[in-house]
Design a protein with these regions (language model features):
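Conserved alpha/beta enzyme-core scaffold
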Residues: 1-123
Length: 123
């Protein structure tokens, strides 16, 4: 098992979803976490290179979706759903409400439909 802070895990997922090569962090330098990881020194300060993570499948929940898969979240749904949708090869969304295209204000779309492969009506 590999232990990560929630923020490090989220950033590794975000890096994978948006095609980044990873990110640098000083967190973990001089601890067990640093073993086996590349250390990069910038201006005399050491950083660990945390490589990106990719998911095969993401199962996420949205408050509202249109039939093109554009998603709106409510409350804590905003945390990592958009990041996981961008990261996964296949994204399956359960939506509380599914509306016709054009019935959602585009200014409030949190995840564009391009990241959604399957849409299911939920409870």
């Amino acid at each position: 098992m590999i232990l990560y802070l929630r923020e490090q895990l989220a950033e590794r997922i975000r890096s994978g979803g948006f095609g980044l090569g990873g990110f640098l962090t000083p967190t973990g330098i001089g601890t067990e976490v640093a073993k086996g990881k590349e250390v990069i020194t910038i201006d005399g300060k050491d950083y660990l290179l945390e490589k990106p993570l990719k998911a095969d499948v993401a199962l996420i929940f949205a408050n509202k979706a249109d039939k093109n898969g554009n998603l709106q979240y409510a409350g804590s749904e905003n945390n990592f759903n958009h990041v996981m949708a961008a990261n996964a090869k296949t994204t399956i969304v359960e939506a509380r409400e599914i509306v016709d295209v054009g019935q959602m204000d585009p200014n409030f779309v949190h995840t564009p439909g391009i990241f959604v492969n399957y849409l299911v009506k939920g409870a």
